[in-house]
C-alpha cells in the first residue's frame, strides 16, 4: 500500500541553491561556476521574500552562508535538503533525466563555436531557406531575435543558434515562416542530430511575433528531444499502471516516454500553476504521479541575468503555493525542486552547476526537519518506493524520513 496516494513533483527550472562540489569543471564565459549561487545571490542582491516556502523550511537548508532574506523556521511544516548532480552536464534534459533515475555518463555534444557547415547546409537544402550565419553561435534567445529578427522579416532566412546546452534552436517570425513549416524544419534537424559528432539533446522551435524593437517569443515553442537511453521511473510507473501526468515541457523532455497523460505546454508559470491545479482536481486522478516544470525562472530571468525579475518570479510562485496545497488531499505529497542553477548575477548567460533545493510537504506529516543530503535521483527512488516499483539506474529513497 502506498504511503502517499498521489505525489506531485514541481521543478522550479534553474532555482539552484549554491555551487556544487564539481562546479570548477563547469564554466560561464570562461569563468568557473565555483561562486554561483542562484537563490543566495538573488536574496543578497535583490531581496527575496518567500514566506510560504520558508514555512516549509527553505531557509533551513544547510548552506555555508544562510539565505540573507529567507529566515530559518523553528517548527517548519515540511522536510528539506539539497541534492547534488552526478551526471556530466548542467542542462535541462540531464537534470530531469537524473531526477527520474538515470546517470548520464556521456554528455551530449555542445557547439561553443556554432554548428558545422555540414549541418547548416543540410538544413538549407531541406528547407529551401538560407541560414543567417552570423547567428550561428551560443546566443540568448531574446537577443538573437532582437539582432536578426528584422533581417529575417526582410529575407525569410532562418535564425539557427545554440547555447552552452546541447541544443539547436531555430527562431522564426510566425508571419514570415509559418509555425507548421518551422516544425517540419525542426523535425528534419532532429533526424540529422541523433549521433556523434552531433548528438544533441534537443531541437527547439522558437516562434516569435511582433515588430523590430518589440519582438516576443510565443507559446508555440516545441521541443524535439531524444528518448531517454533506458527506462526512467516514469516508465516503471506507467508499466505498473500508475498514471503519470506531465505539465509544461516535461513531455518534451522525456519525448513522451513514460507519460500517460500530457496536460500540455505552459504559456507562463502562472498558466502552468493553473494547469497543475486543474490536474489535481481531476476526479479520475485518485492515485499517481504528476510532474510539472515551471520554466520562466530560467528562460525569462536566469539567462537574461535579471535578478530582480527572477526575484519577482519566485515571489509569484510563492504567492500561489497555498493554492496548490489547498487542492491537495491529506495523503498527497508535494515535492518542490529544481534541475540545475542559473545564477542571474553570474558571468555569461548560461546555466550554473549547483545543488538543487528539495522541499517536501504533506498535510499528513506529523514531523519535520532535514532529509539527509543526497543526489537528484533520490527523488525518483522515493517515488518508486512509494508506488512499489523498481528504481531506474541510481537513487536512494528518503521516503522513510517523511513522517
Curated annotation (Swiss-Prot):
UniProt keyword terms in alphabetical order: Cytoplasm, Isomerase, Manganese, Metal-binding
Taxonomic superkingdom: Bacteria
A GO CC term assigned to this protein in UniProt: cytosol
CDD domains: PPM
UniProt source species: Streptococcus pyogenes serotype M28 (strain MGAS6180)
Gene (UniProt): deoB
Entry cofactors: Mn(2+)
Name this protein carries in UniProt: Phosphopentomutase
Gene Ontology biological-process annotations: 2-deoxyribose 1-phosphate catabolic process; 5-phosphoribose 1-diphosphate biosynthetic process; metabolic compound salvage; nucleotide metabolic process
Protein role: Isomerase that catalyzes the conversion of deoxy-ribose 1-phosphate (dRib-1-P) and ribose 1-phosphate (Rib-1-P) to deoxy-ribose 5-phosphate (dRib-5-P) and ribose 5-phosphate (Rib-5-P), respectively.
